[in-house]
């Protein structure tokens, strides 16, 4: 049985991974630890085989460029995971999984100009969130060796029942709008159960390295809004002819490019083993909305 400590009690991903691993009785013993304050330093890690570090400050538009928040991002997203990993290694933990982000690449995709992230794409974070995560990666990866395996996960948008963030905006569109722009774009996203299954496989394998999870299918924003509406028992009509207006609006409103641009991981970059996507895109939307 693998003994796992999730550092970051109450985090969406940590909570969902714990629930997912509970479906495999007798294989995993999972605990959570709140990382607020200094009390965690008194916790012994000697009873654990694996630490999954999910604690962190999430990406917030209101703070991502504010200089007043730079120190806080560094303390929580860089210094904390490094301190946890150092303690884990010193106390005999065998594997450390760090939840990073696609934002370490610092890429945006203006509508009509697709961007594909490959193994050769350099890191170029552009805000406090991305920079703090990239800085943590730079300090964690050299700690990896035969007895202490460090795995870095760089998920794109994560969604599932109870999630927050960008998916919530799509839910709002699907719930309120009778029509929605038809745009031919593609984006990488990952359903929480698919992410949890990858984490489970990484734990089973004692894997180390950098992993960029995504669903087996790229997401089209317009189709996803329509599918969410359908799962809610509504119908949203997709109407073409708005691309020029969205391109113009995207020049002034970054959120437009985030919603309708094409930003994807290369398939080969996301491959692992025989696969980890336990749910299709269609299945994941139905499960999220019901």
Identify the residue ranges that each predicted region occupies.
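Glycine/proline-rich active-site loop of Rossmann-fold NAD(P)-dependent oxidoreductases
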Residues: 134, 147-148, 158-169, 201-211, ...
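A conserved pocket-lining segment of Rossmann-fold NAD(P)-dependent short-chain dehydrogenase/reductase
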Residues: 172-190, 194
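Glycine-rich NAD(P)-binding loop of the Rossmann-fold in SDR/ketoreductase-type enzymes
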Residues: 72-83, 123, 127, 131-132, ...
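NAD(P)H-binding glycine-rich loop region in Rossmannoid oxidoreductase-like domains
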Residues: 37-90, 105-107
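Conserved Rossmann-fold NAD(P)-dependent oxidoreductase catalytic core, especially the SDR/UDP-sugar
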Residues: 83-128, 151
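Mid/C-terminal beta-alpha module of Rossmann-like enzyme folds, strongest
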Residues: 198-256, 279-290
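Active-site Tyr-X1-5-Lys
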Residues: 124-151
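N-terminal Rossmann NAD(P)H-binding glycine-rich loop of SDR-like oxidoreductase domains
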Residues: 3-23
